[in-house]
Amino acid sequence: MRMVIAAVGRLRQGPEAKLIADYLDRHAKAGRALGLPPVTLAEVEDKRGGGMVAEAALLARAIPQGAALVVLDERGQMLSSPEFAARIAGWRDQARDVAFVIGGADGIDPGLRDGADLAISFGRMVWPHMLVRVMLAEQIYRATTILAGNPYHRE
C-alpha cells in the first residue's frame, strides 16, 4: 500500500509546511505498527497556463495506477473522522494504494473528479489549498490514532 497526497502548487516554507510535516511525521511513526505507510507528497505545477485540464494531466501522473482516488472538493461528502479512518482501514486491508488529490485555485477538472472513488469535503466553504493540505494531513494522522485506539481523537 502507498499513500500519496497529489496537490497543485508548491508549498513554500512557513507555518503550513511545518504543520504538514509534523502531522505526516506523526502519522508515519504511529502508522507503521498498523500497516499504514508514510504519506508522500507529490506537488504539480502547470507553468504553461493550461488550467484545470493541464493540472489534471499532471495530477494523474502522480497517482499510482489502480489507487483509490480521493478528491477534495466542496461538493464531496462530509465524513466524520471515524468514517474517514474506516475508509483508510478498508484500503489498507485491501492492500490498495490511495491518492488524495487537492486541486488548484479553480478546483479539479471534472474529467478527473468524476472518476474518483470518493469525493470528500471539509465543509461547504471553499478553503485555500495550502490550508486544505494541513487539514488533510491532520485528518490522516487523526485516522491513524483512531485505528490505533489512541486518545488523540475524542468523541
UniProtKB/Swiss-Prot annotation:
<comment type="similarity">
    <text>Belongs to the RNA methyltransferase RlmH family.</text>
</comment>
<keyword id="KW-0489">Methyltransferase</keyword>
<feature type="binding site">
    <location>
        <position position="72"/>
    </location>
    <ligand>
        <name>S-adenosyl-L-methionine</name>
    </ligand>
</feature>
<dbReference type="InterPro" id="IPR003742">
    <property type="entry name" value="RlmH-like"/>
</dbReference>
<dbReference type="InterPro" id="IPR029026">
    <property type="entry name" value="tRNA_m1G_MTases_N"/>
</dbReference>
<keyword id="KW-0698">rRNA processing</keyword>
<keyword id="KW-0963">Cytoplasm</keyword>
<comment type="function">
    <text>Specifically methylates the pseudouridine at position 1915 (m3Psi1915) in 23S rRNA.</text>
</comment>
<comment type="subunit">
    <text>Homodimer.</text>
</comment>
<keyword id="KW-0949">S-adenosyl-L-methionine</keyword>
<keyword id="KW-0808">Transferase</keyword>
<dbReference type="InterPro" id="IPR029028">
    <property type="entry name" value="Alpha/beta_knot_MTases"/>
</dbReference>
<dbReference type="GO" id="GO:0005737">
    <property type="term" value="C:cytoplasm"/>
</dbReference>
<dbReference type="Pfam" id="PF02590">
    <property type="entry name" value="SPOUT_MTase"/>
</dbReference>
<feature type="binding site">
    <location>
        <position position="103"/>
    </location>
    <ligand>
        <name>S-adenosyl-L-methionine</name>
    </ligand>
</feature>
<dbReference type="GO" id="GO:0070038">
    <property type="term" value="F:rRNA (pseudouridine-N3-)-methyltransferase activity"/>
</dbReference>
<feature type="binding site">
    <location>
        <begin position="122"/>
        <end position="127"/>
    </location>
    <ligand>
        <name>S-adenosyl-L-methionine</name>
    </ligand>
</feature>
<protein>
    <recommendedName>
        <fullName>Ribosomal RNA large subunit methyltransferase H</fullName>
        <ecNumber>2.1.1.177</ecNumber>
    </recommendedName>
</protein>
